[in-house]
UniProtKB/Swiss-Prot annotation:
Phosphorylation of dTMP to form dTDP in both de novo and salvage pathways of dTTP synthesis. The keyword Hydrolase does not apply. The gene is tmk. It comes from Synechococcus sp. (strain JA-2-3B'a(2-13)) (Cyanobacteria bacterium Yellowstone B-Prime). One of its GO terms (molecular function) is dTMP kinase activity. This is Thymidylate kinase. GO terms for cellular component: cytosol. InterPro entries: P-loop_NTPase, Thymidylate_kin-like_dom, Thymidylate_kin_CS, Thymidylate_kinase. One of its GO terms (biological process) is dTTP biosynthetic process. SUPFAM superfamilies: P-loop containing nucleoside triphosphate hydrolases. Keywords: ATP-binding, Kinase, Nucleotide biosynthesis, Nucleotide-binding, Transferase.
Length: 206
């Protein structure tokens, strides 16, 4: 089963990913915990450039994320799924649509085509969207990297993007309120994940 966590800055994805993976392992599931960018050696290099380097043009940024994703799927995600593991990934294709599409204003259909090329059509079985108003998330994040230092209007557009994506695919993308303590949010996530675990099968777009 392939699970992704999505959301804006400061929503607590890293914390919730760790708690979810811990719970899955307690329940006896073999898990892979990974992230984008940064899930491969190439990804770690690109992550440093993308999050802490000088700004790129929107198109260059998009293509770097796609290169990271192609390597990540090929070398990490696809082999783990083939081995029967539950893969839990911090960010995937929906982040590219929200940030580079809605946030940067790049063409959504072209981003979808590039995502499809980079992933070979691989889609998450379940996407957990951690929902938190941008103003609250940015206050939590305290501008730790370049993306978090973007203007509030950019983050509002990203938030609207996640709203639109969730509305378009309600069976896959489930909104989870990120308000409350980490334990409270983790309980909400588990209530969504647990019923879907018996249905875990490898899934690809047609």
């Amino acid at each position: 089963m392939f699970i992704t966590l999505e959301g804006g800055e400061g929503v607590g994805k890293t914390t919730q990913q760790a708690l979810l993976v811990e719970r899955l392992r307690q329940e006896g599931y073999a898990c892979l915990c990974t992230r984008e960018p940064g899930g491969t050696a190439l990804g770690k290099t690109l992550r440093e450039l993308l999050l802490h380097g000088d700004p790129f043009s929107p198109l260059a940024e998009l293509l770097l994320y796609a290169a990271d994703r192609a390597e990540h799927v090929s070398k990490v995600i696809a082999p783990a799924l083939a081995a029967g593991q539950v893969v839990v990934c911090d960010r995937f294709t929906d982040s590219t649509l929200a940030y580079q599409g809605y946030g940067r204003g790049l063409d959504l259909e072209k981003i979808r085509q590039l995502n499809h090329l980079a992933t070979g059509g691989l889609q998450p079985h379940l996407t957990l969207w951690l929902d938190l108003p941008p103003e609250v998330g940015l206050a939590r994040a305290k501008a730790r990297d370049r993306l978090e230092q973007e203007r509030l209007e950019f983050h509002r557009r990203v938030y609207q993007g996640f709203q639109a994506l969730a509305a378009a695919e309600p069976q896959r993308i489930v909104r989870i309120s990120a308000q409350g303590s980490p334990a409270e949010v983790a309980a909400r996530l588990w209530s969504v994940v647990e019923p879907r675990l018996p249905l875990a099968t490898a899934g690809r777009e047609p």
